[in-house]
Amino acid sequence: MAVNREDFQEAIVKIGRVTKVVKGGRRFRFTALVVVGDKNGTVGFGTGKAKEVPDAIKKALDDAFKSLVTVSIKGTTIAHDIEHKYNASKILLRPASEGTGLIAGGAARPVLELSGVKDIIAKSLGSNNPNNLVQATVEALAKIKG
């Protein structure tokens, strides 16, 4: 599925510095976790690793466009409650009445913002590791039956 990248917005969820200790000292690299979405029912996430931060972000964006999923949005919210677990992270998503807004924290918030859901209540249960929480949220949104 060919997508027009200009229609999508991006959010950098996490940038981390990782270290490899070698004989001559330490070698630093950077990891990036990025979420992309068109605020109209399509969202994806990706990770990238490189020696410089901008390169890691670019790799993460390329990865994110390979993992786009379609979200079934009913009005400004989702159709039903859903609970999804990925590794030790668990996310609970509940539909909310119009005007409630986006009540979500941590790494789940940018995923829900960029998916186009405007009224939702999300609760993170278990681990708040950004990588696992983003994946749990995306998988939960993909499982919703319209």
Swiss-Prot record:
GO CC terms of this entry: small ribosomal subunit
Function field: With S4 and S12 plays an important role in translational accuracy. Located at the back of the 30S subunit body where it stabilizes the conformation of the head with respect to the body.
Self-association state and partner proteins as the record states: Part of the 30S ribosomal subunit. Contacts proteins S4 and S8.
GO molecular function: rRNA binding; structural constituent of ribosome
Family (UniProt): Belongs to the universal ribosomal protein uS5 family.
Domain notes: The N-terminal domain interacts with the head of the 30S subunit; the C-terminal domain interacts with the body and contacts protein S4. The interaction surface between S4 and S5 is involved in control of translational fidelity.
Name of the gene this protein is made from: rpsE
Residues in S5 DRBM domain copies: 8-71
Protein's UniProt name: Small ribosomal subunit protein uS5
GO BP term (any one): translation
Organism: Aliarcobacter butzleri (strain RM4018) (Arcobacter butzleri)
Xref: InterPro entries: Ribosomal_Su5_D2-typ_SF, Ribosomal_uS5, Ribosomal_uS5_bac-type, Ribosomal_uS5_C, Ribosomal_uS5_N, Ribosomal_uS5_N_CS, Ribsml_uS5_D2-typ_fold_subgr
Keywords for this protein: Ribonucleoprotein, Ribosomal protein, RNA-binding, rRNA-binding
Keyword Ribonucleoprotein assigned: yes
The keyword RNA-binding appears for this protein: yes
